[in-house]
């Protein structure tokens, strides 16, 4: 049962967390290198 439910939990988790981390790192990178 756990092995059957694991992908259904991991797929949305990876699908939501990975883009969030990518967007946050990109945002911080842009903020750090922004020239005023």
From Swiss-Prot:
Q: Which UniProt keywords apply?
A: Chloroplast, Membrane, Photosynthesis, Photosystem I, Plastid, Thylakoid, Transmembrane, Transmembrane helix
Q: Which GO terms describe its cellular component?
A: chloroplast thylakoid membrane; photosystem I
The subcellular location is: Plastid, Chloroplast thylakoid membrane
Q: Biological process (GO) annotations?
A: photosynthesis
What is the protein's known function? May help in the organization of the PsaL subunit.
HAMAP family annotated for this entry?
PSI_PsaI
Name the chain's protein.
Answer: Photosystem I reaction center subunit VIII
Q: Which organism is it from?
A: Vitis vinifera (Grape)
What gene is it encoded by? psaI
């Amino acid at each position: 049962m756990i092995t059957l439910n694991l992908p259904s939990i991991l797929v949305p988790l990876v699908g939501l967390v990975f883009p969030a981390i990518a967007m946050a790192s990109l945002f911080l990178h842009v903020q750090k290198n922004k020239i005023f």
